[in-house]
Design a protein with these regions (language model features):
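Extended, low-hydrophobicity, Ser/Thr/Pro/Gly-biased non-transmembrane segments
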Residues: 1-117
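Extracellular/periplasmic catalytic domains that process cell-envelope and extracellular macromolecules
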Residues: 38-41, 99-102, 130-131, 168-170, ...
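Hydrophobic beta-strand segments of well-ordered beta-sheets in folded domains
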Residues: 47, 136-137
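Helix N-cap / beta->alpha transition motif
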Residues: 52, 71, 121, 139-142
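Hydrophobic alpha-helical and helix-loop surface patches within well-folded domains
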Residues: 108, 138-286
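Reverse-transcriptase-like RNA-dependent polymerase core
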Residues: 117-134
């Protein structure tokens, strides 16, 4: 958790006891979760999360009691487009006043997933974009709204590209959340930054939904199928959606604006990694 503009923010990850996976290769897996790779059993989750009534919550799975906790009238007030002209990092407005005696319970149901995560924040505002019967929701802290307007659209584009080229996404939604992080969990990604710099992060975390999310492979045993494959997917999506070159902020420095050359996505996301590892004397295990 952390605090911004006087409001508490919560990311609920690795928050409950998990049973070791028993698989055909290793039997009971004994790798300890040390804040990095993880491996879980597929199952059904029914989770009820109770927060103060001013919190907006999203999580793995289907929101069962949407009409109760997020009725249409409130959803319209929270729509990200309403805050398109909000000054960056300015004080958020109050949509739902805090009352210490009022609580809401958000009920999520998820089937055939191997983990459950959630995010909650009173300043979240909601964007939405669809591809076929899939939906990408963006949860954006209101002070960041002006530079997150295309997050849901970009996320839906990633779903389209990955589904058409690598096998269709099996779940009904994916979340991209403005959560000062860079991690993936079934149906939900916790992200940071702003457009256009966050594009590679969003593509990367959504890309994790393929091997990590839907197949649920042992990341410790086959690390290449986790970060390695996902880094390839990141470059693939950026090239398909934005073209050969990375979209970057306009250079305000005179020298850079005159001589700077944009990076190719394949270089930035794939090839330069080897250079960085060599110069930092790092050689990650694949």
């Amino acid at each position: 958790s952390y605090e911004s503009w006087g409001y508490k923010h919560y990311n609920g990850v690795h928050w409950y006891p998990r049973i070791s996976v028993y698989d055909s290769k290793f039997g009971w897996t004994k790798d300890q979760h040390l804040g990095r790779e993880f491996y879980g059993n597929f199952g059904t989750f029914d989770v009820k999360l109770t927060f103060a009534s001013n919190f907006i919550v999203e999580a793995t799975g289907n929101l069962v009691n949407r009409s109760e906790v997020l009725p249409d009238e409130l959803r319209e007030k929270l729509d990200l487009k309403n805050f398109a002209n909000k000054k960056w990092n300015s004080e958020p407005s109050v949509i739902i006043p805090y009352n210490k005696n009022n609580r809401k319970t958000w009920y999520f149901h998820a089937e055939n997933v191997h983990d459950f995560a959630f995010t909650a924040d009173p300043t979240y505002r909601i964007g939405e974009a669809r591809w076929k019967d899939k939906v990408c929701y963006s949860l954006v802290q209101e002070p960041h709204a002006s530079r997150w307007l295309n997050a849901a659209d970009f996320g839906a584009e990633c779903l389209k590209v990955f589904s058409e080229d690598f096998g269709e996404y099996v779940y009904h939604k994916v979340i991209v959340a403005d959560a000062q992080d860079g991690m993936e969990y079934p149906m939900i990604t916790l992200d940071r930054g702003s457009d256009p710099g966050y594009r590679d992060l969003l593509a990367h975390e959504i890309g994790h939904m393929w091997f990590f999310g839907q197949i649920g492979n042992n990341e410790t045993y086959r690390a290449l199928l986790d970060e390695g494959f996902t880094q390839f997917l990141t470059a693939w999506a950026l090239i398909k959606i934005d073209g050969e070159f990375m979209i970057e902020n306009k250079k305000t420095n005179w020298y850079k604006s005159k001589f700077y050359k944009p990076f190719k996505a394949i270089d930035s996301e794939i090839y330069y990694s080897y250079i960085k590892d060599a110069t930092k004397q790092k050689d990650p295990v694949l």
